[in-house]
Amino acid sequence: MDLKLLDILACPICKGPLQLSEDKTELISKGAGVAYPIRDGIPVMLESEARTLTTDERLDK
C-alpha cells in the first residue's frame, strides 16, 4: 500500500485518521475502534469488512 495514501484517507465511520498496522495488513481507526483489511495492496474500507479492535488494541498507543 502507498503510504502517501494515508495522508488523504479517513475512516468512513468516524472521519478520523487511520494508522497502518505493524504488519501492514490493516488500516486502524482508533476513533471508530475498527480495523479495515488491506487486500492485494488495496484498503477495503467498508464497514461490513471491518473488524472490531480488541480492548488491548484500543488502548495501545
Curated annotation (Swiss-Prot):
GO terms for cellular component: cytosol. Gene3D superfamilies: 2.20.25.10. Coiled coil: none annotated. Belongs to the UPF0434 family. This is UPF0434 protein Pmen_1615. It comes from Ectopseudomonas mendocina (strain ymp). The lineage of its organism: Bacteria, Pseudomonadati, Pseudomonadota, Gammaproteobacteria, Pseudomonadales.
